[in-house]
A protein has these predicted regions:
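Hydrophobic small-molecule pocket/channel-lining residues, especially in calycin-type beta-barrels
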Residues: 1-152
């Protein structure tokens, strides 16, 4: 089967860099808790001034959920995240070109230090997503998924 042509085209405006993520996506992976399935849905909300992410991680009998809002704060693309374990975080767009030239990257100061999440295009038309923590020698990747579009 031939590789699917990348649809990783950023849009216009301050939220335009998130255009490639709009829609519903799914990844399956192994984890310390066993097999997991994660779905991510990105959609424009509130007059297209914000993007909402709803993510659900399904681990066997359990689940972990996240709702995040992406928008502009003090002229900087930012996010505010809330999770089903009661935690919250917020961060801002950052440079992720060390991962991929077209990466979409956000950094956040977490209790354990600086962390980032990075999205970048996959050759099959989906995308990769990773979470990394800042260490002395650069970034330590501790989670990575490969997402495919969910057929609608």
């Amino acid at each position: 089967m031939a590789a699917k042509k990348s649809t990783w085209k950023k849009g216009r405006g301050k939220l335009g860099s998130l255009q490639p993520l709009l829609g519903s996506w799914e990844a399956e992976s192994d984890s310390p808790m066993g097999k997991l399935k994660c779905t991510r849905t990105f959609k424009l909300i509130l007059g297209d001034k914000y993007i909402e992410l709803y993510a659900r991680w399904q681990f066997g009998k359990g689940a972990y959920e996240e709702t995040a809002i992406y928008g502009i704060n003090d002229d900087v693309l930012s996010f505010w995240s809330f999770t089903s374990d009661g935690k919250k975080s917020q961060g801002y767009v950052a440079d992720g070109t060390d991962v991929h030239p077209d990466a979409i990257c956000f950094e956040a100061n977490m209790p354990a230090g600086l962390a980032r999440m990075v999205y970048w295009p996959a050759d099959d038309g989906g995308f990769h997503w990773a979470v990394e923590s800042k260490v002395k020698k650069g970034w330590n990747r501790f989670t990575m998924h490969h997402y495919h579009a969910i057929a609608t």
